């Protein structure tokens, strides 16, 4: 039986003789035209450690596709480094790159009539970009995560990239020596691989195991390890079998499997960015999913993993403790996962987890039993109020001060806010407002890791609030609220905040409130004028023109 269901459109028949001529130039033989064409979307790049170790994974996938009797077709996907662009204008391209990656994969797979695709990625937006593409085109596909970085070490302390961001605030506050500052800087990132805590890259890749679109254990492997290469090869073999079975992403990505993915995100203390990305993935798969669904799952799924940024451990520790399968087995036994969801292997999630122990190992402290959860409810909460009528997102677990009411310190760009923090112009009790940074206004919802880390480094993490219509890095923690919708650029209430206004952030009531009377707000609204777009040409201008609100995933189509 032939499995080239799609590629036959470009290789078969008399009229396709010129097409075959070009394939012959690539080394194809006549018998190859009856084999399926498998794309390898290779995100390898030397601009970031997150992607610098992907080539050997892609090479392993190519070899495995050949061994499985199919034709590998390699094409590239772009990336930017969130960590390197953080705190600069370059960060505005981060979320935009999610859309660009999705469009690149769609363009190559559809334009070349590929029968399946192995997506290999590393940095934060590689994962949602790839999964959006797979859900959109609905061609058999699998996601191969590049793997996590190993933790750095300095004077007996484990380090991640967030350690370096927080060191900026500590150093400028006089709380860290020059030696330690440089020691953290030089040792925070010791290997290739994505940032090591349960930040955005590890959050999304972990959730893909639960979604059913990545192999078990693959998300917590370290990039430098041989098992990561072996997993990439096995993923490619599984994908070829999925092509033979005609098992497509939308057979796997369902509302129930997204619930599984989000449940794992809650259980592991994952990134706020997951809210934005799963809204986008669901949209691509044409699944009814809203921010209210996150709140529904938060209320029933506890946090059972002690992982950075708010906890102690990193992804390699989680891997040693049993990985995401161990987390999923605990959730499944507690009735918190849909075990009948299909996975890319052709087996159900429950079948995949059959041999995983029901009790986590006693010699580890990363994964807690359900009855010993760190928090009884999930950490990613949807806040609403007159400052966020369409919702905002916050991490609410572990806060020493879950309610803050304080004067607004208003900034219309990130750099001004960061300067104020580093210059000690932000005081305990203040609520920093960073606005005109939403999908349209930023554009691109840049992440605010630099200012939030500076606040923590200054020792103000428990006493200063920060709200924004932009985003936060997965490495952010503290009294911070992002994804405020409607955003300032379209006239959301956040645009009407004035310096010194009283603002309340209440994690108990899930409230984000500007304490100004309605008459005054109406007066301000009547006087407000939309600012001119920051960009009028190029990809940022295109994104700003097309982007939907944050509560709809900030998608472009």
Curated annotation (Swiss-Prot):
Its cofactor is [2Fe-2S] cluster; Mg(2+). It catalyses: (2R)-2,3-dihydroxy-3-methylbutanoate = 3-methyl-2-oxobutanoate + H2O; (2R,3R)-2,3-dihydroxy-3-methylpentanoate = (S)-3-methyl-2-oxopentanoate + H2O. Pathway: Amino-acid biosynthesis; L-isoleucine biosynthesis; L-isoleucine from 2-oxobutanoate: step 3/4; Amino-acid biosynthesis; L-valine biosynthesis; L-valine from pyruvate: step 3/4. It comes from the Bacteria. InterPro entries: DHAD_IlvD/Edd, Dihydro-acid_dehy_C, DihydroxyA_deHydtase, DiOHA_6PGluconate_deHydtase_CS, ILV_EDD_C, ILV_EDD_N, IlvD/EDD_N. Pfam families: ILV_EDD_C (PF24877), ILVD_EDD_N (PF00920). Mg(2+) binds at residues 82, 124-125, 447. One of its GO terms (molecular function) is magnesium ion binding. One of its GO terms (biological process) is L-valine biosynthetic process. Binds 1 [2Fe-2S] cluster per subunit. This cluster acts as a Lewis acid cofactor. PROSITE patterns: ILVD_EDD_1, ILVD_EDD_2. The active site is at residue 473. [2Fe-2S] cluster binds at residues 50, 123, 195. Its EC number is 4.2.1.9. The modification N6-carboxylysine is found at residue 125. Keywords: 2Fe-2S, Amino-acid biosynthesis, Branched-chain amino acid biosynthesis, Iron, Iron-sulfur, Lyase, Magnesium, Metal-binding. Functions in the biosynthesis of branched-chain amino acids. Catalyzes the dehydration of (2R,3R)-2,3-dihydroxy-3-methylpentanoate (2,3-dihydroxy-3-methylvalerate) into 2-oxo-3-methylpentanoate (2-oxo-3-methylvalerate) and of (2R)-2,3-dihydroxy-3-methylbutanoate (2,3-dihydroxyisovalerate) into 2-oxo-3-methylbutanoate (2-oxoisovalerate), the penultimate precursor to L-isoleucine and L-valine, respectively. Homodimer. Belongs to the IlvD/Edd family. PANTHER family: DIHYDROXY-ACID DEHYDRATASE DAD, DIHYDROXY-ACID DEHYDRATASE, MITOCHONDRIAL. This is Dihydroxy-acid dehydratase. The lineage of its organism: Bacteria, Pseudomonadati, Pseudomonadota, Betaproteobacteria, Burkholderiales.
């Amino acid at each position: 039986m032939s499995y080239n269901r799609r590629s036959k459109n470009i290789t078969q028949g008399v009229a396709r003789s010129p097409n075959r001529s070009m394939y012959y130039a690539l080394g194809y033989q006549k018998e190859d035209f009856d084999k399926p064409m498998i794309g390898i979307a290779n995100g390898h790049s030397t601009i970031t450690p997150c992607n610098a170790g992907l080539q050997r994974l892609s090479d392993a996938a190519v070899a495995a596709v050949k061994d499985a009797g199919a034709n590998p077709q390699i094409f590239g996907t772009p990336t930017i480094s969130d960590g390197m662009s953080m705190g600069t204008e370059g960060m505005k391209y981060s979320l935009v790159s999610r859309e660009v990656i999705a469009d690149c994969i769609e363009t190559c797979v559809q334009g070349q009539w590929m029968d399946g695709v192995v997506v290999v990625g590393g940095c934060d937006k590689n994962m949602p970009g790839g999964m959006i593409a797979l859900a959109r085109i609905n061609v058999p596909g699998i996601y191969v995560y590049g793997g996590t970085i190993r933790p750095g070490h300095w004077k007996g302390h484990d380090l991640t990239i967030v350690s370096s961001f927080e060191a900026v605030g500590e150093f400028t506050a006089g709380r860290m020596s020059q030696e330690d500052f440089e020691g953290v800087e030089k040792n925070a990132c010791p290997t290739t691989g994505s940032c090591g805590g349960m930040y955005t890259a590890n959050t999304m890749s972990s959730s893909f195991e639960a979604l059913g679109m990545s192999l078990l254990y693959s998300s917590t492997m370290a990039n430098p390890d041989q098992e990561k290469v072996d997993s990439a090869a096995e993923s490619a073999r599984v994908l070829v079998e999925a092509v033979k079975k005609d098992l497509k992403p939308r057979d796997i990505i369902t509302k129930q499997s997204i619930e599984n993915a989000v449940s794992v995100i809650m259980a592991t203390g994952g990134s706020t960015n997951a809210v934005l990305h799963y809204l986008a993935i669901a949209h691509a798969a044409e699944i009814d999913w809203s921010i209210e669904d996150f709140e529904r799952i938060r209320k029933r799924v506890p946090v059972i993993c002690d992982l950075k940024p708010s906890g102690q451990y990193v992804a390699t520790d989680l891997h040693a403790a049993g990985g995401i399968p161990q987390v999923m087995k605990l959730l499944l036994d507690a009735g918190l996962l849909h075990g009948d969801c299909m996975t890319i292997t052709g087996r159900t999630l429950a079948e995949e987890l059959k041999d995983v122990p029901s009790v986590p190992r006693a010699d580890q402290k990363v994964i807690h039993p359900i009855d010993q959860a760190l928090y009884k409810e999930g950490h990613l909460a949807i806040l609403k109020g007159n400052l966020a009528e369409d919702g905002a997102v916050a991490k609410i677990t572990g806060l020493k001060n879950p309610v803050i009411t304080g004067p607004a310190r208003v900034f219309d760009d990130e750099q001004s806010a960061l300067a104020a923090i580093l210059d000690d112009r932000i005081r305990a009790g203040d609520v920093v407002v960073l606005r005109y940074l939403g999908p349209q206004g930023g554009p691109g919802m840049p992440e605010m890791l630099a200012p939030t880390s500076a606040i923590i480094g200054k020792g103000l993490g428990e006493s200063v609030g920060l709200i924004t219509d932009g985003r936060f890095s997965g490495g952010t923690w503290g009294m911070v609220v992002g994804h405020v919708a409607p955003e300032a650029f379209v006239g959301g209430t956040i645009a009407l905040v004035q310096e010194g206004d009283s603002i309340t952030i209440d994690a108990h009531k899930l409230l984000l409130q500007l304490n100004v009377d309605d008459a005054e707000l109406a007066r301000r609204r009547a006087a407000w004028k939309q600012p001119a777009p920051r960009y009028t040409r190029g990809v940022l201008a295109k994104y700003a023109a097309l982007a939907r609100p944050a509560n709809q995933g900030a998608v472009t189509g």
